[in-house]
Amino acid sequence: MDLDLNNRMTEDETLEKAYDIFLELASFNLDPADILLFSLQFEIRGGAELLPPSDGWLKHVDFNPNPDFFAEVIIGLAESEDAEINDVFARILICREKSHPIYHILWKE
């Protein structure tokens, strides 16, 4: 797979794309109670964080996600506006290269 450093999504575009994917697939992968909780609380306590891919992804994908091209987006709820996300609804490994719309999601169990 040829990836181009000059054809990457920005961090904001990556967060937006990951969140759009989350919204599209959440109803098929999350418990209805979790969907309701997330919907009711997102404006107050919700968030999405962009991180380099963690080593944990090596257990779930058959390649090493290069941080130049892949990001991990965590979507969930925090205890307060200033706190870190502690109730994770999805971890999304997403390719930032625009011509390779690759992603993998680990859903809340």
From Swiss-Prot:
Highest taxon of the lineage: Bacteria
Pfam family, one: DUF440
SUPFAM superfamilies in UniProt: Putative dsDNA mimic
Disulfide bonds: none
Classification via InterPro entries: dsDNA_mimic_put, Put_dsDNA_mimic_sf
Protein's job: May act as a double-stranded DNA (dsDNA) mimic. Probably regulates the activity of a dsDNA-binding protein.
HAMAP family per record: Put_dsDNA_mimic
Protein family: Belongs to the putative dsDNA mimic protein family.
Protein name: Putative double-stranded DNA mimic protein plu2488
Source organism (scientific name): Photorhabdus laumondii subsp. laumondii (strain DSM 15139 / CIP 105565 / TT01) (Photorhabdus luminescens subsp. laumondii)
